[in-house]
């Protein structure tokens, strides 16, 4: 009886077969046009972003204020309203090149109509336009683009109608370390550097404007002026930092807090000295304790330099630069990468003097943060260094006889397997330390 009522049919219409009761129910299809309005609103509200905003007096959040909707089913507008905005078939062209509002007659005409108003809607088409434009300029200048896929992807979504252009800067800036030139270009200005046929950095850069090729010279000069200011800053910081030895900056680490309850960066450097020596003896690496301690003490020193304070992306890179100019270090700790394992395996033992502080740094950060209760419990890891392959991959160069606790802690594991293993990880840390 209850089953029949649930299916909205009479009991006499039920079908009994092989001990089971069936109900034959015919579902009538709904009108597509009637379903689409709610589907359209669901698509918009279903988009999630790490950060969103609300505007006006609306109780509605989105990544940016919504100005208009274009929603078409064939040539008919799909009617709906969201965030006080009604759907229609009218869009707007490029802010500077477009001629204002324009009508989209049908979905099939969408892409071509937008193009007529200087909007390239397909990101793959924009990417191809950018690549072809950059390559053409590089060929004309006899250079090779230092391509960065992440930067390219970012630029693709920064422009609606891309046009590549080339700029230059004073050759005197080439006296700076390469990283001090490339970092402001890529990370701050979204420029693409170039190398000459000998692999040397050129005093040229490539960039992409959001517009056509009109008045490119004016745009070029504007970009050159902005980059010049960035490089002036880098030059000043570099020259000021070079007035002191890298070791002199370790004292300044006493004024930089690492984490509440875990002391300053100077305290962290002191711990690294002890951990590297411990690992050296525990793993029987056969490294020089004095060199390990020296590298550990200097590993964080560049965090107190003006260059790194201004361009944080240069952490470790400038430390190597300053260390090389003031003292002969056997191997400076390189910035963490996903290829730490390969780096260690393919280098002689001398390089491990520089690698060991990096490994010790990860140990110290993970154990310290865990001890303070900062333990990842989901997919959002508050400790990016804990999830990087650079830590677990180091187990590949551990000698025979390494403790099971240490190998277990360093064994590569997927993020999914890490989740929900708090007690197990804490147990491994306890066994290890």
Outline where the language-model segments fall.
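Amphipathic alpha-helical "coupling" segments that flank catalytic cores
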Residues: 1-433
């Amino acid at each position: 009886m209850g089953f029949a009522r649930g299916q909205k049919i009479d009991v006499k219409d039920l079908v009994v077969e092989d001990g089971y009761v069936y109900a034959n129910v015919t579902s009538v299809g709904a009108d597509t046009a009637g379903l689409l309005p709610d589907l359209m609103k669901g698509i918009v509200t279903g988009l999630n972003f790490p950060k969103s905003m609300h505007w006006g007096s609306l109780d509605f959040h989105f990544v940016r204020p919504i100005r208009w909707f274009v929603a078409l089913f064939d040539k008919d507008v799909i009617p709906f309203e969201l965030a006080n905005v009604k759907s229609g078939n009218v869009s707007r062209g490029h802010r500077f090149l477009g001629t204002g509002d324009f009508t989209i007659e049908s979905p099939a005409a969408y892409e071509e109509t937008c193009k007529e108003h200087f909007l390239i809607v397909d990101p793959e088409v924009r990417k191809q336009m950018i690549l072809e434009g950059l390559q053409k300029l590089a060929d004309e200048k006899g250079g090779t683009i230092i391509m960065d896929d992440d930067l390219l992807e970012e630029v693709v979504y920064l422009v609606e109608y891309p046009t590549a252009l080339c700029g230059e800067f004073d050759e005197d800036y080439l006296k700076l370390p390469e990283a001090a030139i490339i970092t402001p270009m890529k990370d701050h200005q979204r420029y693409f550097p170039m190398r000459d046929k000998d692999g040397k950095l050129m005093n040229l850069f490539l960039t992409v404007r959001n517009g056509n090729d009109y008045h490119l010279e004016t745009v070029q000069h504007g970009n050159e002026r902005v980059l010049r200011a960035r490089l002036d800053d880098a030059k000043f910081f570099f020259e000021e930092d070079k007035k002191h030895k890298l070791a002199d900056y370790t004292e300044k680490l006493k004024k930089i807090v690492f984490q509440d309850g875990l002391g300053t960066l100077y305290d962290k450097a002191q711990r690294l000295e002890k951990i590297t020596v411990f690992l050296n003896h525990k793993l029987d690496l056969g490294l020089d304790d004095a060199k390990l301690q020296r590298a550990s003490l200097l590993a964080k020193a560049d965090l107190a330099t003006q260059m790194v304070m201004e361009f944080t992306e240069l952490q470790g890179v400038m430390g190597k630069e300053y260390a090389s100019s003031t003292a002969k270090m056997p191997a400076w700790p390189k910035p963490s990468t996903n290829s730490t394992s390969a780096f260690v395996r393919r280098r002689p033992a001398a390089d491990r003097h520089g690698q060991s502080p990096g490994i010790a740094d990860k140990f110290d950060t993970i154990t310290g943060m865990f001890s303070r209760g900062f333990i990842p419990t989901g997919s959002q890891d508050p400790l990016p260094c804990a999830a990087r392959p650079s830590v677990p991959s180091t187990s590949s160069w551990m000698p025979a006889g390494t403790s099971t606790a240490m190998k277990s802690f360093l064994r590569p594991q997927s993020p999914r397997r890490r989740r929900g293993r708090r007690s197990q990880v804490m147990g491994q840390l306890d066994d290890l330390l």
